[in-house]
């Protein structure tokens, strides 16, 4: 995610659910790669010192984030608070956001209390998604990669409204369908959404590309971890100069109009699952019934012949 978003030196980076600050440490390491920090001007160093922000709600995780940033020499700004609370509204104007919001409903089942998002819902991921795209700088280049569960792609009601606003505010250009159980609990299906904030708040998404890294893939877990090599084909497709020229069955595209015709669902781009029975490939039911009846008749005839032989043996005795 970090390599594809590619944070640059001096860009302000943010993780609104930072955990132990892993994404921001990765962003820091990517940004300084090949850079001599001692050669920076005072202005460049000041911008660099103000580049890496995070918010974490859990106190223990917040302390670990501070320690992790210190150990990696990251000039971090990490607050212990709720990104969905009004106090976090000050955190805006970022160039890069990398994050994996927590899974589940809002604590206590209440709606978010932020009044700077359009749709206050009980769905934590939908609230985080709104906070994320509204926290990006509206300059046409601020960008994000966020891990979200499948329900964000197809939830109706406010879910549909949030997706429409996302595609209006941002160019939602790519969705990576991840294997099951990679993030969150085993069995939870997740995705990575890649988007760039537009300069306006209307019609920024023209088409959305999907890469299916889920269907017909091996089972991943502790004994068979997902590795960088599994993403090679996706990265080739993502970075291709002409995405339409990529020859990969897992790579597909839907225009904004096609998505609208499907009710603005983003639960798209999955290829045929070879493990699932396709009922269209089954023979005609009437033909199957005739074959079954013929087999039964043959079996009955065979049984009757056995009965006759047994009766004959009884007579001989």
Give the ranges of each region predicted by the language model:
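Conserved S-adenosyl-L-methionine
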Residues: 2-99, 104-106, 115, 122, ...
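A conserved structural/catalytic subdomain of Rossmann-like adenosyl-cofactor enzymes
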Residues: 88-317
